[in-house]
Amino acid sequence: MDLPAVPSSVLEALQGSARSLGIPRLALVGGVVRDQLLHQRWGRDWSGVPDLDWVVEGDTAALVAELSRQVGSERISGVQTHGSFGTVALQLDGIPLDLASARQEHYPAPAENPVVRMGTLQADLSRRDFTINAMALDLVTGELIDLHHGQQDLASGQLRLLHAGSVADDPTRVIRAARYAARLGFQLAEESHLQIRSTIQQWPWAWTHGDAALSAPPALASRLRMELERLFEREPWPQALDLLEQWRALPLLDGQLQNDPERKLRLRWARRLGLPLMPALLLGAADPVATAQRLQIPGKQQQWLQQCVALHNWLADTPPCLEASPSIWSTALEQQGWQPEAVALAVTLRPKPWKPLLRWWGRWRKIQAPQTARDLLAAGWQPGPGMGEELRRQRSAAQERSR
């Protein structure tokens, strides 16, 4: 299998270093193998080489040292070592490489972080999420290793979980399934679809909705959020969210999100207003603030959600009348101390008086008094409450003129 845009000098240097040390396996793994097969055999567009992920049956630190000895340190840059298994990131001739020792893992409890130990390439491939991501190109032998029939699923456009306990072990795989299916245009294999639905219905995890938010295991908390962030940042997210809804998988986030008819409108408004999509999505949850805490979204976004919920309740109780002037609406909103993003999030909910909120977000809040405190002092005003009142009066008048 050829690797376009990867210089042969890079491959030869890695191959030579592995052979010098007697390393039995040095294999390219992950999305680059999948995408290159799709390109070569099925004519998919080649989007260029991402970071290259390699699995080593042996000592990665020793391999990097031998590589440096053979090619010279001037060709290698940015060497960083991470973790107890000697994962090494570097650049060889400007090409990013990530090398990791082969490993195997088991889950001490569903949705907890796995326990990892050294293993073989075969074990490393068997711990992955989908058959199409569990292939490897062995640089030492030139062999394409496909233990789980990933090529067959590529040919048929199927996305298949690797084993029967995949979702129970790591529910973030469901979000990844939606990401890949939306990006590649693949169909979820029937048994994988059944596994997702039945696992979520059975709910094998120790934590459940209503429990303390911060007691959720990582794959139902921060790691679930990270997959959602990747979905919003990298993928055709409207299609991916539709798939999660079709698979009845949104209860992983919150049961109410599974039946959320306003989701698409909320997210369209959030994008239009330049807001992060995550808090707009979570506004459809039964308890948006608790869900945000569990997923550990950024603190400022949690604050926006808290304020948005408070604003929504305020609108239901004692808002200004719909026909109130710009200055009255501005004063009422600003006295509450709500951040602008919280008001914009409230717009995505389309409450009955949503237009004044939108106008405040887009225009009224940005209007300033035509004069500054320095101007008033120069005109003979004395410092004190009266000067502040005059500046507020001027700003209100300017807001009224903006109707």
PLM regions with names:
Residues 1-403:
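Catalytic cores of the polymerase beta-like nucleotidyltransferase superfamily
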